[in-house]
């Protein structure tokens, strides 16, 4: 089953790479996109695992980027899926959007899971790398690599770190604002 999943995921990734090279970006406000994904995940995981996902912003009115709407959805959904996978029941996940200096937007996804082993923060974006314990199920190790590629397609960066304020992980996506 794991080999079949790897082949399927890898095949999908290759198709996505070809599709990405043909897709056109346009000016989009990422806030409603992110809120929609957060709402969708809350509808499932609040009941299923007692996990509450909150959305916060820095009070900005609009968060415009040049992007591809469904790819931004894919980035947020994949990062939330990972945060949920590493969170115990009845925990909180926060998605924060804020404007940074230099016309950039930061999207932080903060969970209350186990956090990262320091040696893993650089490896997790590699193709086929997975540090997920067996209790979380089998995974291909392609998800965060795909996210990284999608972020880079949007001329952005992604970083993984441990939270400073409490136990848990922090994934930060930085995208150029228009």
Q: Language model features by range: what are they?
A:
Residues 18-23, 62-67:
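Conserved micro-motifs of the catalytic ATP-binding
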């Amino acid at each position: 089953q794991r080999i079949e999943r790897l082949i399927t995921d890898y095949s999908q990734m290759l198709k996505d790479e070809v599709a990405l090279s043909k897709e056109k970006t346009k000016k989009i406000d990422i806030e409603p996109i992110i809120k929609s994904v957060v709402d969708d995940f809350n509808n499932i995981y609040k009941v299923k695992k007692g996990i509450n996902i909150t959305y916060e912003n820095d009070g900005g009115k609009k968060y415009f980027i040049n992007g591809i709407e469904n790819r931004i959805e894919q980035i947020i959904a994949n990062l939330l899926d990972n945060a949920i996978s590493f969170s115990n029941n009845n925990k909180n996940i926060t998605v924060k959007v804020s404007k940074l200096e230099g016309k950039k937007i930061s999207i932080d996804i903060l969970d209350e899971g186990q956090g990262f082993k320091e040696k893993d923060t650089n490896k997790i974006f590699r193709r086929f790398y997975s540090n997920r314990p067996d209790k979380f199920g089998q995974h291909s190790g392609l998800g965060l690599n795909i996210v990284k590629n999608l972020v880079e397609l949007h001329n952005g960066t992604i970083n993984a770190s441990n939270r400073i304020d409490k136990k848990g992980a922090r994934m930060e996506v930085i995208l150029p604002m228009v």
